[in-house]
UniProtKB/Swiss-Prot annotation:
UniProt: 1-deoxy-D-xylulose 5-phosphate binding residues: G180, A206, G207, N228, T229
Known catalytic reactions: [ThiS sulfur-carrier protein]-C-terminal-Gly-aminoethanethioate + 2-iminoacetate + 1-deoxy-D-xylulose 5-phosphate = [ThiS sulfur-carrier protein]-C-terminal Gly-Gly + 2-[(2R,5Z)-2-carboxy-4-methylthiazol-5(2H)-ylidene]ethyl phosphate + 2 H2O + H(+)
Active site: K119
GO molecular function: thiazole synthase activity
Subunit-structure text: Homotetramer. Forms heterodimers with either ThiH or ThiS.
Entry keyword annotation includes Glycoprotein: no
UniProt KW Transferase keyword: yes
Keywords: Chloroplast, Plastid, Schiff base, Thiamine biosynthesis, Transferase
Biological source species: Porphyra purpurea (Red seaweed)
Name of this protein: Thiazole synthase
Assigned protein family: Belongs to the ThiG family.
Length: 277
């Protein structure tokens, strides 16, 4: 009989649930829904990943519906997934607020009546797609007052992250590098500072290109990662989705386990005391 192995109770029980506001989730990998080869590829990748939270661009979903086309929203089982509507494409705070309200209508039609989540994106920069810190702060404050669970996408700015936490944001979502670039962890020091200072979940969003990069930020103490292009543009999206899932889980376990101290000198693996010469 093979020996069985189970994780310590503190890893797999309620103490390590990923919580946003008053909702708990079992997976710390969140997925985007754009850039897939086709609709079925997206659905299969999401299913393989084990992700609980899937983000959908409100504008794209609305435009697809208006054109009478089948979209990803119609193809997913929303009794098993939590939709995170986002304000992608909004260039101002005012526009983001308006689109967020439209997103609430879509969410309610899917039967998630207690879902007030919004991924806030205010991006006037069309070249590098860098978020507007002032517009984000302005829109976040308004949406929080309206009862939204606000999850702002931001640059890797520790001061802004703390300001957003202080006004009541449920999470902060700093970028690792520009959206869709696959450049990886270009702001690692700032991400470390944000994670260290935060009392709310820190979700690393944008720029992650490989599972090792996802695992690295989880090792540092990030609460979760959101991945889209790295999976959607992989040669085999389903395999990459599985790899990302394993990396996120591995990184989280590493963080909980605690890394060994780094030593300047070598230390023998086996004790030499008592060994005869």
């Amino acid at each position: 009989m093979k020996p069985s192995f189970s994780l310590p109770h503190f890893v797999n029980d309620q103490l390590d649930q990923f919580k946003i506001s008053d909702k708990s989730f079992s997976s710390r990998l969140m997925l985007g829904t754009g850039k897939y080869k086709n609709l079925q590829d997206a659905i299969n990748s999401i299913n393989v990943s084990g992700a609980n939270i899937v983000t959908v661009a409100i504008r794209r979903a609305q435009n697809t519906k208006n054109l009478g086309r089948t979209n990803l929203i119609d193809g997913l089982d929303w009794s098993k997934l939590w939709i995170l509507p986002n304000t992608a494409g909004c260039e101002s705070a005012e526009e983001a607020v308006r689109i967020a309200s439209l997103g609430q209508e879509i969410v309610k039609k899917l039967g998630q009546f207690d879902n007030n989540f919004i991924k806030l994106e205010v991006i006037p920069d069309s070249r590098y797609l860098l978020p507007d810190p002032i517009g984000t702060l302005k829109a976040a404050e308004y949406l929080i007052n309206k009862g939204f669970v606000v999850m702002p996408y931001i640059g890797a700015d520790p001061v802004l992250a703390k300001q957003l936490e202080n006004i009541g944001c449920a999470t902060v979502m700093p970028l690792a590098s520009p959206i869709g670039s696959g450049k990886g962890l270009r702001n690692l020091l700032n991400l470390k500072i944000i994670i260290e200072n935060a009392k709310i979940p820190v979700i690393i969003d944008a720029g992650i290109g490989t599972p090792s990069e996802a695992g690295k930020v989880m090792e540092l103490g990030a609460s979760a990662v959101l991945v889209n292009t790295a999976i959607a543009r992989a040669k085999n999206s389903q395999t990459m989705a599985r790899a990302m899932s394993l990396a996120v889980e591995s990184g989280r376990l590493t963080y909980i386990a605690g890394r060994m101290p780094i030593s300047e000198k070598a230390e023998p693996s086996s004790p030499i005391l008592g060994i005869s010469k």
